[in-house]
Structure formats: C-alpha cells, structure tokens
Amino acid sequence: LRAGRREGRALFDYRRADFPFAMRTVARLRAAVDEAQHGRGVALVKGLPRDALTADEFELLTWAIGLHLGVARPQDRQTRYINAVKDVGVDYRSPTGRGYSSRAELDFHADSGDIVMLTCYNQAPAGGDSLVSSGVTAWRALASERPDLAHALQTRPVPFSRQGEQGEGEAQFTQVTVFARTDTDVFCAWNRNRIVNGMKLEGAPPVDDAQREGVE
C-alpha cells in the first residue's frame, strides 16, 4: 500500500495496478465477492492491518480493495465515494437524514450497489453492531405466506424519497418496485425509511392497500 501511495494524490488518480496485492489476497477478496453475490449475500474478511496504518492510509486501503472488486459509485449528491460512519447529529427519520451520519438504530435496508464494503478503523465505544438479513429469504417467505403482497411489491412501484439529494429539475422521489426477478435471481430494493418518506412527498403517486401492507 505504501509503495503505491503518493502524497496529495486524489483517490480517483489511483489505478488497480498501483496496488499489486499478493495473489492469495486477491483470491481471498474474489472469494468474498463470490460469497456476497452468489452465496450467503454477505462475506466477512478479517485481518486488515489497522494498527500499522494511519486513518488516511486505511481509507486508501479501502479504496485499493475496491479497485480490485469493481467500479466505485457515488453515495450521495456530493459524489462522495467513501463516507465515514459517524454521529454528527443527523435525524435519521428526517426527510434529508442519512443513517451513517446519525446514532440511530437503522432499519434493515438494501443499498443500491452490486457490492457494498464496510471497513472498520475505530471500534465504536458502544453499539456499532451490524445485522444482516436476506432479501431473497424475505421474498420467499412473503411469496409463500402472502402471495398477494409479493405480487403487489413486485409489479407496482412505490415512491422512494431521494432524501433531499435530487439534482436540478429532478423530482424529490423516484419510483421502483421493492422486488424484481429474472429466471435465476431476485433483486430487492428495500429501504423502509425512504419509502415511508417518499409516500409523504407532494406529487408522489398514491400507494394501494396491498403495497402499504407489504411495506409494513
């Protein structure tokens, strides 16, 4: 990592070739991606060299790992690609709240990237636990127990609030179905906080009883 690091160099100026990880490290990362995409849906990689790195170096390590996994996508209107999970007093339930800037217990939700990476530099004094659930399992349970609600959430879009991060000329919300399917895969676009906030926005299309019950 330090061999590839250049003082003052922006993250976007780095390339995968700047960080020639050992083959065993690359294999471990690729196995984690495969597990996340085609296995349990989540993978835990331990042993990152936190004690040997400064906070800036650890951020660069996170970026370097990402370069070996895919193409980074922005997380917010400010086009930040790496965000610190830190309580800065944000109200998670507000129309513009983001969970990573609050101390709230977050709802289960599915982020929009193909792979989401969370690295830990500082252990939280209290809390900070992560829970993982399966959108595929949720779909199977809903389709088995309430096929009417599963059908509603698969075929009729619900409003998703943009949490105040819409671009100029864009609506405050977008519309997506909670579930989508192909012949082999199930996709889940679940974020209850954004859906509930989206339902309250002016101009948002009304949802029917089945959609509302499915969300609840």
List the predicted regions and their residue ranges.
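Active-site environment of non-heme Fe oxygenases that use a 2-His-1-carboxylate facial triad
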Residues: 1-26, 31, 38, 43, ...
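"Short basic amphipathic alpha-helical interaction patches in structured regions
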Residues: 56-63, 133-134
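A short alpha->loop->secondary-structure connector
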Residues: 62-72
